[in-house]
Swiss-Prot record:
Function, in words: Plays an essential role in viral replication as a component of the DNA polymerase processivity factor. Excises uracil residues from the DNA which can arise as a result of misincorporation of dUMP residues by DNA polymerase or due to deamination of cytosine.
Tagged with keyword Magnesium: no
Designated name of the protein: Uracil-DNA glycosylase
GO BP: any one term: DNA repair
Subunit-level organization: Homodimer. Interacts with protein OPG148. Component of the Uracil-DNA glycosylase(UDG)-OPG148-polymerase complex; OPG148 and UDG form a heterodimeric processivity factor that associates with OPG71 to form the processive polymerase holoenzyme.
PROSITE patterns linked to this entry: U_DNA_GLYCOSYLASE (PS00130)
Active site: D68 (proton acceptor)
Species name: Variola virus (isolate Human/India/Ind3/1967)
The keyword DNA damage appears for this protein: yes
Amino acid sequence: MNSVTVSHAPYTITYHDDWEPVMNQLVEFYNEVASWLLRDETSPIPDKFFIQLKQPLRNKRVCVCGIDPYPKDGTGVPFESPNFTKKSIKEIASSISRLTGVIDYKGYNLNIIDGVIPWNYYLSCKLGETKSHAIYWDKISKLLLHHITKHVRFLYCLGKTDFSNIRAKLESPVTTIVGYHPAARDRQFEKDRSFEIINVLLELDNKAPINWAQGFIY
């Protein structure tokens, strides 16, 4: 692991070597906006804004991307809910349960699945207000997601409205799937088969499929 310093909390960002090419720009962009971000109480706390930068990228095949953290109790790991109370991760787990037949589980975490990096486009929000920090993170968000898409084969974005123009923001030739948000109305996410489709496409590309059942916690 490497680390860099920034002028505001969290003051130190620890990161895996695979993120090295974007770190100088990240530090510059963060120092420009941090004082505005940190006027608010945030979800997650600043010490957890950049926790996913500790993840390697070269061993990832799929990025599962949400728009921003939970408005309360964000951990810095997208979709993670240690007490398994958040609707989004519960719906994701239900979807994987239907796909895999696994039923006796107590939680689910995308961050423990080989080949997968969960990501949030915006890395924080004001406590209780989803997408409230979008304007501050925008430059950083584009920088980091573009870097991720240089490594993964598939970008799976959860939220048809939030990610309607995501392809226009990407320069890498990554296959992008935009599906329903897990909390979408009328239980639309239940009909979404993107996890299954990703594995079909990986196999067509002669890549190993994702073992989505690996995310279950027992």
